[in-house]
Amino acid sequence: MARILGVGRSSASSLNNKEDNESDVALLSPKDPNRVHTKEQLAHPASSNLDPSMQGLPAGLSLDDFIPGHLRTHIGSSSRGTRVPVIRNGGSNTLNFQFHDPAPRTVCNGCPPPRRDGSLNPDPAWYQTWPGPGSRPSMSPKPPASQHAQNWSATWTKDSKRQDKRWVKYEGIGPVDESGMPIAPRSSVDSPRDWYRRMFQQIHRKMPDLQLDWTLEDPPKVVSARASSAEPRHLGTLQRPASRPGTTETSSGRNWNHSEETSRNTFNYNFRPSSSGLHPPNQVPRHREKVENVWTEDSWNQFLHELETGHKPKKPLVDDPVEKPAQPIEVLLERELAKLSAELDKDLRAIETRLPSPKNSQAPRRPLEQPGLEQQPSARLSSAWRPNSPHAPYFSSSRPLSPHRMADGGGSPFLGRRDFVYPSSAREPSASERGSSPSRKEEKKRKAARLKFDFQAQSPKELSLQKGDIVYIHKEVDKNWLEGEHHGRLGIFPANYVEVLPADEIPKPIKPPTYQVLEYGDAVAQYTFKGDLEVELSFRKGERICLIRKVNEHWYEGRITGTGRQGIFPASYVQINREPRLRLCDDGPQLPASPNPTTTAHLSSHSHPSSIPVDPTDWGGRTSPRRSAFPFPITLQEPRSQTQSLNTPGPTLSHPRATSRPINLGPSSPNTEIHWTPYRAMYQYRPQNEDELELREGDRVDVMQQCDDGWFVGVSRRTQKFGTFPGNYVAPV
């Protein structure tokens, strides 16, 4: 007996199996030589000579499936409605089916079919069509081709060794629900492929849209070229034939050769899409057009091939439509880089419009090598130095404070302007730079400024200036320092020491009036005063003060009798004994004609006091910050009415810094020399520059000059060296 592959287990009851076995035994003819052998096989299945694969068959099998057709009795045609095909083994790839009689009878065509009776004639569609061992094919005539065309279909196993015929319950894909999904099992329909196709489309109809290779030239066209090329074949298969090729063969046991089986194999099955799932090319639904276009005939055949064989496909079912760029990546990168470069250039231009021109901030230091600066309009320079400009220096109405004042706890008690931190960007001008001056035309194009205070240079890079001088600004070193030129000399100076002149004003230097001290005044300190500024004079209670001039009604300028300390102080701290007498002169400062005899000895060493830049408008009505919080009684003595007493600034008597020898004061006093004044060091001082003098406590120092910044110039008797040192480190002997 031939080997049957893939026969599944049955779910029928044992009672039905027993009835089927009894009916199968009754179907055997008495004259059949195989009847006795068949009975023995049924009675002793373990000792039968069946194929080993047939031993231990499921109990749901009946002998109708194994008895040749010419030995079977007729079975009523009504049993055809009770045969329901069921897929076993989880839907194996061989697509083999097991037929059983369900327990509750199903309704077929509106009426319940009768129970199968073994005494009735069997339907020829239910017995096997392949010959058994030793048997010959039946020579019975073939029925008409259309007799069972709608009642059965063929299914082949994978090894192509045999064929089986089964009953078909539904035509096409069978009934569907309201959404279009098939209801009947796939094994009970006439077109399982169409059934599977419809089932797949209904399950995946909401799947994400697949990316297709759309043509950019024709936007309304949504069907790809590959899908449109397959449409003629789809349209040509809309008219399905009434029966499939080869289904009209009779069941008279013809021999199946391998060539015929291969031509009718499911692997070579011609894909025929269902007419219910197709639409005209111009009426493709929006939600299904991409799925229809992607799953072509070849894709479906390959997908079903993989489903039946379980093998991996050689190529993807649907080509992954990788979106290719319209242009090469190099072109896109170059375009993006050009766009970024354009944006960067735009931002840089916007920044350049908001910032000053680099020619202003990076002008050459040499005046003769500035062609770009000469060609700049004065309007731009004036706008750069407006008070509301972000680069405009801060102009104070009073003399600027010292940048640093040492704390009481350590370091030098007072170093004055020696503590200035000069900008590192300004290099020392050479002699050629200081000696070279631009032309008058160049000076007019530069911005001019007038000095508000005297400025004494402390390093070669600085420029010594006096109040009222005109200086031409070359550039701004930083927010605190400017670089400019005065009388051919180039250097830096503080920005808050100058006042920038308007463009329409002619730069003309203003010299302060010169006063001659006719008679020095006299005062006695009633309270101890400690100055907070360089120009302020500190004294103790009871010290006598020589008055030089009256700055205004609240401030006096004077010096401590017997010392070289000089400065301004509030009038409320002293008792005025005698007001100083001054005289305005145009020829320069002169010594008093008849000085006080009590102060002659002291005036000899201080005949020309250092200049202190004091503006009466700056000091009027102002007190020291530290003194403002110190309560003291106001005992201001009314000054005596004198015509020589002035409320205007006093004389500004200045002279250049002293050298190592006594300095001749010039033609105004040709016979006057500065005498040395002995001082004693009160504190130890370590020099910080080469021109400074080392002091130890108790050293004797001969002071030659007292500078306006609080520093003294003299010679140490211990080291016999000449230099400068802070004046508050020493005291007069």
Swiss-Prot record:
<feature type="region of interest" description="Disordered">
    <location>
        <begin position="129"/>
        <end position="165"/>
    </location>
</feature>
<feature type="region of interest" description="Disordered">
    <location>
        <begin position="1"/>
        <end position="51"/>
    </location>
</feature>
<feature type="region of interest" description="Disordered">
    <location>
        <begin position="584"/>
        <end position="672"/>
    </location>
</feature>
<dbReference type="GO" id="GO:0043410">
    <property type="term" value="P:positive regulation of MAPK cascade"/>
</dbReference>
<dbReference type="InterPro" id="IPR036028">
    <property type="entry name" value="SH3-like_dom_sf"/>
</dbReference>
<dbReference type="GO" id="GO:0005634">
    <property type="term" value="C:nucleus"/>
</dbReference>
<protein>
    <recommendedName>
        <fullName>Vinexin</fullName>
    </recommendedName>
</protein>
<feature type="modified residue" description="Phosphoserine">
    <location>
        <position position="610"/>
    </location>
</feature>
<dbReference type="InterPro" id="IPR003127">
    <property type="entry name" value="SoHo_dom"/>
</dbReference>
<feature type="region of interest" description="Binds to vinculin">
    <location>
        <begin position="444"/>
        <end position="579"/>
    </location>
</feature>
<feature type="compositionally biased region" description="Basic and acidic residues">
    <location>
        <begin position="32"/>
        <end position="42"/>
    </location>
</feature>
<feature type="domain" description="SH3 3">
    <location>
        <begin position="674"/>
        <end position="733"/>
    </location>
</feature>
<feature type="modified residue" description="Phosphoserine; by MAPK1">
    <location>
        <position position="594"/>
    </location>
</feature>
<keyword id="KW-0206">Cytoskeleton</keyword>
<feature type="domain" description="SoHo">
    <location>
        <begin position="164"/>
        <end position="232"/>
    </location>
</feature>
<dbReference type="GO" id="GO:0051496">
    <property type="term" value="P:positive regulation of stress fiber assembly"/>
</dbReference>
<feature type="compositionally biased region" description="Polar residues">
    <location>
        <begin position="245"/>
        <end position="256"/>
    </location>
</feature>
<dbReference type="GO" id="GO:0005737">
    <property type="term" value="C:cytoplasm"/>
</dbReference>
<dbReference type="GO" id="GO:0017166">
    <property type="term" value="F:vinculin binding"/>
</dbReference>
<keyword id="KW-0130">Cell adhesion</keyword>
<feature type="domain" description="SH3 2">
    <location>
        <begin position="518"/>
        <end position="579"/>
    </location>
</feature>
<feature type="modified residue" description="Phosphoserine">
    <location>
        <position position="459"/>
    </location>
</feature>
<comment type="subunit">
    <text>Interacts with vinculin by the first two SH3 domains and the proline rich region of vinculin. Binds to SOS (guanine nucleotide exchange factor of RAS and RAC), through its third SH3 domain. The formation of this complex is down-regulated by phosphorylation of SOS. Interacts with SAFB2, INPPL1/SHIP2 and SRCIN1. Interacts with DLG5 through its third SH3 domain. Interacts with SOCS7 and MAPK1/ERK2. Interacts with FASLG.</text>
</comment>
<dbReference type="GO" id="GO:0031589">
    <property type="term" value="P:cell-substrate adhesion"/>
</dbReference>
<feature type="compositionally biased region" description="Polar residues">
    <location>
        <begin position="638"/>
        <end position="651"/>
    </location>
</feature>
<dbReference type="Pfam" id="PF00018">
    <property type="entry name" value="SH3_1"/>
</dbReference>
<dbReference type="GO" id="GO:0005925">
    <property type="term" value="C:focal adhesion"/>
</dbReference>
<feature type="modified residue" description="Phosphoserine">
    <location>
        <position position="624"/>
    </location>
</feature>
<keyword id="KW-0597">Phosphoprotein</keyword>
<dbReference type="Pfam" id="PF02208">
    <property type="entry name" value="Sorb"/>
</dbReference>
<feature type="compositionally biased region" description="Low complexity">
    <location>
        <begin position="597"/>
        <end position="613"/>
    </location>
</feature>
<keyword id="KW-0965">Cell junction</keyword>
<comment type="function">
    <text>Promotes up-regulation of actin stress fiber formation.</text>
</comment>
<dbReference type="Pfam" id="PF14604">
    <property type="entry name" value="SH3_9"/>
</dbReference>
<feature type="region of interest" description="Disordered">
    <location>
        <begin position="224"/>
        <end position="285"/>
    </location>
</feature>
<feature type="compositionally biased region" description="Polar residues">
    <location>
        <begin position="264"/>
        <end position="277"/>
    </location>
</feature>
<dbReference type="InterPro" id="IPR035607">
    <property type="entry name" value="Vinexin_SH3_3"/>
</dbReference>
<feature type="region of interest" description="Disordered">
    <location>
        <begin position="352"/>
        <end position="448"/>
    </location>
</feature>
<feature type="modified residue" description="Phosphoserine">
    <location>
        <position position="412"/>
    </location>
</feature>
<dbReference type="InterPro" id="IPR035608">
    <property type="entry name" value="Vinexin_SH3_2"/>
</dbReference>
<feature type="region of interest" description="Binds to SOS">
    <location>
        <begin position="674"/>
        <end position="733"/>
    </location>
</feature>
<dbReference type="GO" id="GO:0005856">
    <property type="term" value="C:cytoskeleton"/>
</dbReference>
